[in-house]
């Protein structure tokens, strides 16, 4: 399953629920304002079982590169890579 997060203001209890369902076979993509989640809640992504990715152009547009946790396992991806990811992971839950 592909989980895409596009907002920065999900309630912590809601994020707890979503991340409890994520398995090794899933992917998580942060884009638009969702890229802020990696900075606000780095512990979620450090413990995430899925393949975590963040859209590079959205990080650059918000000048957040220096704020990303150095130990983060989140991979920066291009828009072209995102297209391939959406083709490979089904179904998709867009949040």
Swiss-Prot record:
Pfam families with a match to the protein in the record: DsrH
SUPFAM superfamilies linked to this entry: DsrEFH-like
InterPro entries: DsrEFH-like, Sulphur_relay_TusB/DsrH
BP GO annotations: tRNA wobble position uridine thiolation
GO cellular component: cytoplasm
Disulfide bridge partners, by residue number: none
Protein name: Uncharacterized protein HI_0577
Organism annotation: Haemophilus influenzae (strain ATCC 51907 / DSM 11121 / KW20 / Rd)
